[in-house]
């Protein structure tokens, strides 16, 4: 640091091209696109620059290296959360084209996604492939599913069948029909493969399956793009790579309190389809079939088929495979609602055990080495399946934790917290020896008509929850895991303004790195203002995703307090700094909601800085509503000063002399 540990740095924002004519700017622009294209340009200085005429606001910042936080920033505060809800997993991460591919509902009945298109179709209830029945296609009978989305690419498929005769699979893609004939000759279920090449992109394809001769029983059909990765959409995975989140929480969320991990392991073609208990209830909850069907139809209409029913195609093994691909730390939430002590213990054995029944069921001999387990989700709330009072739950938590650690004593336990009441205090008092972190969830109110209040809504939620936990932490040195946070009631995709609010909340976590060790934004894909939005053919980074990605890539190491003049009126900007002591670098994060350039310079910074910027023409700009309106740009400047562009989120890295 060259004896500058006590130096007070005063900085004022200056537009970078005000320097000598030798300043060079090299930039790379990236926007979320289907082909991942990017453009780069070298901007040479000119004596007359029209940008100099733009309105610029000068701000003085001061900081001292004596004030560097003693606690390093845990990279897991940039974590994320995926849940089996709506289209987060299925139609988001998972690549399957066929709906209800295992025929959970009898064809043409209840809420089946299949219709009888010709002849008579029965049910084999005596020897079904999986579940309670398998469809029997009698001679010259057929079933159909409409509304399939196919891109202009190659697809691989398969179907299980038994009997003697021929099956015909007819794909109608607009006016073109692609037929595949399969010779079936087996008294037991056998897997038959096929492939098709879609000549065009469409959302109106259909599949008709017909028996051309004697009755044939079918089940578990699948159709996926050839370029899938272990069943996952490659376009979504590439966007997840770009997010660069180091920590993933799964499978819920409210979903987990009705989830049985056994259902999601083993041969995925034989994994059962289940009702999503937390969202649509159990069959016994209804007085009649007609009441249940009416309720299911309503829920499918609002949640989608995969919000109402869980096919269990994406289970624990697939989650671990995804985390491995993304080089991310997995965090598995245990069902402490309707789940049992034995289930919790067995799940840890399945993940980490080297011997035992469940360890032997794992598809690989090596341990998954899952370090972080959460016991339950929001068990403080009466909306949660299995909710009990705090005294009963603390006993349940301790029993679960001891059973799980008897299998692997090295795991870290995240306990259910809620410091908006006395719940967290009571949990820490009773369970401090059986927990390492206390979770906290909050969803901030969206304030559409005032950007400053919109951001402060998130910032103040984070600040309040952290301050309350600080008062509790001393009891047992229990760190905080904010493993769900977002804006509530999000009916639009995540916009630039939402990314700004999320980042403001993250700033509070950075400032309190001695308290907050883990944070998971909710959600990752689709659902509640996902960082990634998908449609049937494309995946896009959204406002929250771009914003968090920029922070994840650049703001690390140690927090450095900084002072500057507060905003006045509805204008809002926010600045945070971190220090990399080994590299003698500081990183400056700026949220600029204004139409002005914020100007920053410091003579003590070395020349040669890098800047990572997210910009939008409007604060409401997003990438999936009206097209790609957000742009992320990385640029290197041979100067010792930077700017914060209007309506932008940026992080600038500068060397300290």
Which residues make up each language-model segment?
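C-terminal motif of bacterial Sec signal peptides marking the signal peptidase cleavage site
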Residues: 18-19
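Extracellular and organelle-lumenal recognition/adhesion modules and their flexible linkers in secreted
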Residues: 43-312, 329-331, 345, 391, ...
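Aromatic/acidic polysaccharide-binding cleft in carbohydrate-active enzymes
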Residues: 84-85, 478-555, 559-575
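An active-site-proximal structural segment forming one wall of the substrate-binding cleft
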Residues: 199, 225-245, 312, 319, ...
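Noncatalytic carbohydrate-binding groove/subsite architecture in carbohydrate-active enzymes
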Residues: 205-212, 350-351, 389-505, 538, ...
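Active-site groove signature of glycoside hydrolases
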Residues: 211, 252, 357-388, 442-444, ...
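Carbohydrate-binding surface patches
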Residues: 571-608, 647-653
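Acidic, Ser/Thr/Pro-rich beta/coil linker or hinge segments at domain junctions
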Residues: 607-644
